[in-house]
Amino acid sequence: MKYIKKLIYVLLLTVATQVATAQIKILYGPYLQNVKENEATIVWVADKPSIGWVELAPNDGTHYYGEERPKYFDTTNGVKNTSLLHAVKVKALTPGTTYRYRIYSQEVLSHEGINVIYGRVAACLLYTSPSPRDTR
């Protein structure tokens, strides 16, 4: 009987450890929404409460990872949203320009007042926006 209790304890401990260390994932997206001449909204869903952002660059032939790209966060009144669903509106886009973008979600492990503890980051592959000629 003692052996069975120990076996169950070890099994439960193993399962609990696996659940606690499961990595955050992007489940759906990115989706381009409300695309206009100089703005677009990028939407995606993560599997854990997280903050989200988009990194964006024009498709100008430079290496995307050769320099740091601007980050556009999912915010409300300047505060980063903690959510499963992320929507980032990117403004001031140059008409006629094709862009490359990548979405990110960073898990929020704890958020008490101004104290936030972040976890792991999930990111998608690099996407390229449709050519302006293809959207007419």
Short names for language-model regions:
Residues 44, 54, 96-105:
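Short beta-strand segments enriched for Tyr within beta-sheet-rich domains
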Residues 9, 38-40, 50, 84, ...:
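Residues at beta-strand starts and edge strands
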Residues 23-51:
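Non-catalytic, glycine-rich low-complexity segments
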Residues 1-25:
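Bacterial Sec-dependent N-terminal signal peptides
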Residues 56-60, 105-107, 130:
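Residue-level signal for short segments within beta-strands and strand-turn junctions
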Residues 108-126:
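Extracellular fibronectin type III
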Residues 127-136:
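Single conserved hydrophobic/aromatic residue that forms the stacking wall/gate
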Residues 53-93, 113:
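Aromatic- and glycine-rich beta-strand/loop motifs that create alpha-glucan
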